């Protein structure tokens, strides 16, 4: 019996380990009949945020929307990880906190990624893209253990691949600070120049940090990319703009109704010595005229979706 239990535990451990390393099929996401392929956005990408209320602190958010991160301070199975650093008076940066935001943490908390996808056009017809909500993380702030999640809004931008301005994380989860002010910069110009550089970099970057709410445990990111569009090559594919099923039923009905009339007229032509012109009756023309607006509206509706 002990041996059987041992095998069961090993088997369960193997199952949980495989769940922790499970990938997200980012190249085949289907919502409301629309397919998205974000495979080219895969890989670990980082973005940093400096908390204005805590001078000297900065947080680096690293994510991979396709598979678990491999080089990170977060637990195994993390898809989104936050590393909070602080710089001391000697200019040495130290890691102060690590936050597991999203991932498959079956071996730790039993929570999984549980992805939720929402087509943006469903919320706003004028906005094209996909909202990706990833779960699984937990973190203790004070005495409270907060559940974490990442909300990534992938917006359609046909001029961007989505890789513009992205940073590659270091093995420890930190990153190189592009555009960071040097220590010998003048104090009077530091804030002004720093803000100007941040604004310029933000305009160039496709992945943008929006907010992190500690009370709700929610990280909000925005990602501009052509792969969020619904009709780009290797990206999204819009619902078919061809005629729908109901439209084809109407067309088939008209054809079936017209066939007996046409057959009768052809028979009459063969029976008469003099040629008799073949034409549709006035009722047929009226029927087609009445159905024409219906076809037009159906085609227009399909094209707009």
Swiss-Prot record:
InterPro entries: Autophagy-rel_prot_27 (IPR018939), Man6P_isomerase_rcpt-bd_dom_sf (IPR009011), MRH_dom (IPR044865). Disulfide bonds join 26-66, 74-81, 156-229. Residues 264-305 are cytoplasmic. Residues 163-202 are annotated as: Disordered. Residues 1-22 form the signal peptide. Its main location: membrane. SUPFAM superfamilies: Mannose 6-phosphate receptor domain (SSF50911). The chain crosses the membrane at residues 243-263. Residues 23-242 are lumenal. It is a single-pass type I membrane protein; Single-pass membrane protein. Residues 24-231 form the MRH domain. Coiled coil: none annotated. Glycans are attached at residues 58, 85. It comes from the Eukaryota. Keywords: Autophagy, Cytoplasmic vesicle, Disulfide bond, Glycoprotein, Golgi apparatus, Membrane, Mitochondrion, Signal, Transmembrane, Transmembrane helix. GO terms for biological process: autophagy. It is found in: Cytoplasmic vesicle membrane; Golgi apparatus membrane; Mitochondrion membrane; Preautophagosomal structure membrane. One of its GO terms (cellular component) is cytoplasmic vesicle membrane. Effector of phosphatidylinositol 3-phosphate kinase signaling. Regulates the cytoplasm to vacuole transport (Cvt) vesicle formation. Plays a role in ATG protein retrieval from the pre-autophagosomal structure (PAS). Belongs to the ATG27 family. This is Autophagy-related protein 27. The lineage of its organism: Eukaryota, Fungi, Dikarya, Ascomycota, Pezizomycotina.
């Amino acid at each position: 019996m002990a041996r059987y239990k041992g095998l069961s535990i090993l088997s369960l451990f193997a199952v949980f380990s495989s769940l922790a390393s499970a990938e997200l099929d980012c190249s085949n996401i289907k919502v409301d009949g629309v397919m998205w392929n974000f495979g080219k956005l895969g890989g670990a990408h980082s973005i940093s945020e400096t908390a204005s209320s805590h001078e000297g602190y900065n947080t680096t958010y690293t994510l991979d929307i396709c598979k678990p991160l491999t080089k990170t301070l977060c637990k195994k199975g993390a898809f989104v990880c936050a590393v909070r650093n602080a710089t001391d008076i000697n200019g040495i940066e130290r890691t102060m906190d690590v936050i597991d935001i999203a991932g498959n943490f079956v071996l730790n908390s039993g929570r999984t990624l549980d992805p939720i996808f929402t087509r943006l056009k469903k919320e706003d017809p004028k906005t094209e893209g996909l909202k990706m909500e990833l779960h699984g993380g937990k973190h203790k702030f004070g005495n409270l253990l907060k559940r974490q999640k990442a909300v990534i809004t992938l917006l359609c931008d046909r001029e961007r691949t989505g890789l513009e301005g992205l940073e590659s994380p270091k093995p420890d989860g930190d990153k190189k600070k592009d555009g960071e002010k040097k220590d010998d910069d003048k104090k009077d110009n530091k804030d002004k120049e720093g803000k100007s550089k941040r604004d310029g970099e933000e305009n160039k970057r496709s992945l943008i940090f929006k907010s992190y709410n500690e009370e709700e445990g929610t990280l909000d990111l925005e990602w501009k990319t052509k792969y969020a569009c619904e009709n780009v090559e290797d990206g999204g594919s819009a619902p078919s703009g061809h005629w729908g099923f109901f439209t084809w039923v109407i067309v088939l009905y008209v054809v079936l109704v017209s066939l007996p009339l046409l057959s009768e007229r052809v028979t009459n032509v063969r029976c008469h010595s003099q040629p008799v012109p073949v034409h549709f009756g006035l009722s047929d023309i009226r029927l087609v005229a009445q159905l024409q607006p219906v076809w037009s509206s159906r085609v227009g509706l399909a094209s707009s979706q």
